[in-house]
Structure formats: structure tokens, C-alpha cells
A protein has these predicted regions:
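Short, surface-exposed amphipathic charged segments that create phosphate/polyanion-binding patches used
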Residues: 71-76, 176-186, 206-211
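Hydrophobic anchor at the start of a short beta-strand
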Residues: 32-33, 56, 109, 162-164
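P-loop NTP-binding site
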Residues: 1-17, 23-28, 189-233
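Conserved ATPase-coupling elements of RecA-like P-loop NTPase cores
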Residues: 98-104, 120-123, 144-150
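Nucleotide-state-sensitive switch-loop elements of NTP-binding domains
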Residues: 2-13, 17-104, 140, 173
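Canonical P-loop GTPase G-domain recognition
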Residues: 134, 141-197
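Inter-motif core of Ras-like GTPase G domains
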Residues: 95-116, 126-133
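Structural beta-sheet core signal
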Residues: 35, 111, 135-137
Length: 233
């Protein structure tokens, strides 16, 4: 039995920084961690966790959608974590597509949001935020209390049931509360019978499989076309 916790969010919001603090806090509380980092190009983030003494594996999706890649590798990730004997398995996503939601029902799903981005940012995150169990607001040291409350309100409009944690990932402020939340989360014994919380976007157009030419004649599979209003003024 182990806890499996997903950290999703856009690029450069501070997922790795927050998670580095969390694994350290959990170690102090007697819980061992393992980390799986999904990325597209570079696997350098795994060295951040290995420097903390945390078993870490990196998956590079390359030309494949990283969130589709993650879901396709859940059985293998689970088997790897079995060999590490960890109490908590953290999975950090690549953070590219705001529409994707690789969380499953048995995971504890978290969404990391940059508090400095915009008060409208939460409304653009889709299932990544709306299906999350908890939300981490990062860079809160760079905004006022009033601005923080506005962002929290925007998060609640999308996901009113999520626990919200305000974190300064540079100093570690707020990480203790997040660590206690994860410590109290339920453990699961297997991925068997697990299902995604939300369907993935279709990924079967001609460009998904390597087409480079532009034009309707070269578009096959699931192709979405815009509708243009006659009066756009």
C-alpha cells in the first residue's frame, strides 16, 4: 500500500521546487518518497531529487504528448515504485497542455498554480484544475494579501471543493501544511481497475503522427476546424 500523488501544472510554476520541500518534510515525518518526473526534452530535474537522496526516474516523452505518455506508463511506474519500497510515489507532469488531466481516481491529484500569473489563469486550466483534490498557489511572497484572495476566489470558481495551499517555494513557507495533507491521504494497493478522472483530448490527427505539410489536403483523422462569425467587429 502506498500513496500516489500527482503534481500537475503549467511550465515554470514551481512544481519541482514545491515537491523538493515536500519530500524533505515527509522524510522528517518518517515517510519515504519516490519521484517520477515526466518531461519532453530534458531530464535534468531528476538530479534535483536525487541530490536529496530520493529515488527518482525520468520519462522523456519526446514526440509523444507527455500526459498521454504518462498514462501509458502507469503500470511500469507502479512496478518501479514497488522496487523502491517507498511510502509515497510522486508523479510530476511536464506541464504543457492545460487541457490534459492525467489524474486517475486512486491518485491524490494536485494542481500547481502561479499566483503571479493572472487572476484569470485558473479559468484557463480545465480538468487539470477542476478535477484536482488540492491546489498549490506558488510565489505568494510576490503578491499582496488582497491579490491572493482574488486568486483563491478564481480557483474556487473552477473547483470549489479543492484544498488550497499558499506556498513560497524559495523559503518553504506553507509546505508543512501541504505535507500534513499528503500524509493524511489514503494509500492504495494497486492500479488495477483504476480509471482516468477525465477523458484525454483526441490525439490522432495527421500532425500527431509526423505530418509537416500545411493545408487541408494533408489533414486526416480527428481534425477540429474553427467557426468564423460573419461580423467579428
Amino acid at each position: 500500500m502506498r500513496k500516489i500523488v500527482l503534481f500537475s501544472g503549467s511550465s515554470a510554476v514551481g512544481k519541482t521546487a514545491v515537491l523538493s520541500w515536500v519530500v524533505d518534510c515527509l522524510r522528517e515525518r518518517g515517510l519515504s518518497s519516490a519521484v517520477c518526473k515526466i518531461d519532453c526534452v530534458s531530464d535534468e530535474d531528476k538530479e534535483t531529487f536525487r541530490a536529496l537522496g530520493v529515488p527518482t526516474v525520468a520519462g522523456i516523452s519526446a514526440d509523444i504528448c507527455p500526459d498521454h505518455y504518462l498514462v501509458s506508463n502507469i503500470p511500469e511506474i507502479w512496478s518501479w515504485a514497488d522496487g523502491q519500497g517507498s511510502d509515497v510515489l510522486f508523479v510530476e507532469t511536464a506541464g504543457l497542455c492545460n487541457r490534459c488531466s492525467p489524474a486517475t481516481r486512486s491518485m491524490v491529484a494536485g494542481c500547481v498554480v502561479d499566483a503571479t500569473a493572472s487572476c484569470k489563469a485558473p479559468g484557463h486550466l480545465g480538468p487539470m484544475l477542476s478535477q484536482a483534490d488540492f491546489v498549490v498557489l506558488t510565489k505568494v511572497d510576490m503578491i499582496s494579501q488582497a491579490e491572493r484572495e482574488i486568486v483563491c476566489r478564481a480557483v474556487a470558481d473552477v473547483n470549489p471543493g479543492a484544498e488550497v495551499f499558499a506556498v513560497d517555494a524559495l523559503a518553504g513557507y506553507g509546505v508543512q501544511a501541504l505535507s500534513r495533507y499528503i500524509e493524511a491521504a489514503p494509500a492504495v494497493g494497486t492500479y488495477e481497475g483504476d480509471v482516468l478522472r477525465h477523458a484525454m483530448p483526441a490525439g490522432v490527427c495527421s500532425y500527431c503522427v509526423g505530418e509537416c505539410r500545411v493545408g487541408s489536403a494533408f489533414q486526416q483523422g480527428v481534425v477540429g476546424k474553427m467557426e468564423f462569425e460573419e461580423d467579428a467587429r
